[in-house]
């Protein structure tokens, strides 16, 4: 769902070394299962790193998926679609333009040059700020924001799942099916989607386990 790394950008060489073992693990896992990686605002322009993992850029989001059984059969239960996105879409035009511009290949090549001649001061500053980030900050009135964001997806009645805000909120109401993931770095948990007569998200905790 994006932001898997504090900072990983295809053109910024100083961000690559730390990520290499994790990229290798993801590629190994992709031999056993399909892995979808939605780029976030801290990790993007990643296609060069992966051969098996399926990368979806900001421009390719949201991703609408048809849920099916483990045997590959299509389901016929209600709300059998789910829409995935990192969450930094459907923002104000100026902010959306800024996010798109920051992913520009030529701009990033230039920034990489500046970073190298300044002994990685730019990337180090970003990483330092990331280390100070409050991973469990609660956004005031996020439930209302979630409902507004849900409307922007235009697929009312189906589930929308986002990251980005890291609020660990599930809204399962008549007209709103919205799930905002928590920060994995803080919660150390993930969710399994169970499909019976309706969609359920089962949290799996990793705290205290050797993983």
Predicted regions and their residues:
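Short, solvent-exposed coil/turn elements at secondary-structure transition points
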Residues: 41, 184, 205-207
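Intrinsically disordered, low-complexity terminal tails and inter-domain linkers enriched
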Residues: 68-78, 202-209
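Conserved beta-sheet core of the metallophosphoesterase superfamily
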Residues: 54-58, 78-83, 88, 93-99, ...
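Glycine-centered small-residue hotspots that permit tight backbone geometry or close packing
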Residues: 1-2, 104, 182
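Core catalytic region of metal-dependent phosphoesterases/phosphodiesterases
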Residues: 1-71
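A short acidic, often aromatic-flanked loop/helix-cap motif at beta-alpha or helix-coil junctions
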Residues: 63-65, 186-187, 207
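N-terminal short leaders/motifs
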Residues: 7-29, 104, 113-117, 130-141, ...
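Active-site-proximal loop/helix segment associated with metal-binding centers of metalloenzymes
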Residues: 73, 84-145
């Amino acid at each position: 769902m994006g932001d898997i790394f504090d900072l990983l950008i295809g053109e910024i060489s100083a961000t690559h070394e730390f990520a290499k073992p994790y990229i290798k693990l993801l590629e190994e896992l992709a031999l056993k299962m399909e892995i979808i990686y939605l780029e976030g605002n801290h990790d993007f322009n990643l296609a060069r790193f992966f051969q098996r993992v399926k990368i979806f850029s900001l421009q390719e989001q949201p991703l609408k998926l048809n849920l099916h059984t483990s045997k590959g059969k299509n389901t016929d239960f209600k709300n059998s679609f789910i829409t995935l996105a990192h969450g930094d879409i459907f923002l104000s035009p100026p902010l959306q333009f800024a996010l798109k511009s920051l992913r520009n290949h030529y701009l990033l090549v230039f920034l990489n040059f500046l970073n190298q001649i300044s002994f990685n001061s730019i990337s180090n500053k970003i990483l330092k700020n990331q280390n100070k980030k409050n991973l469990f900050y609660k956004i005031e009135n996020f439930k209302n924001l979630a409902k507004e964001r849900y409307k922007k997806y235009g697929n009312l009645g189906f589930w929308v799942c986002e990251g980005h805000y890291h609020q660990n909120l599930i809204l399962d109401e008549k007209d709103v099916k919205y799930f905002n993931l928590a920060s994995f770095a803080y919660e150390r948990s993930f969710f399994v989607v169970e499909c019976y007569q309706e969609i359920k998200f089962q949290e799996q905790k990793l705290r205290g386990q050797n993983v």
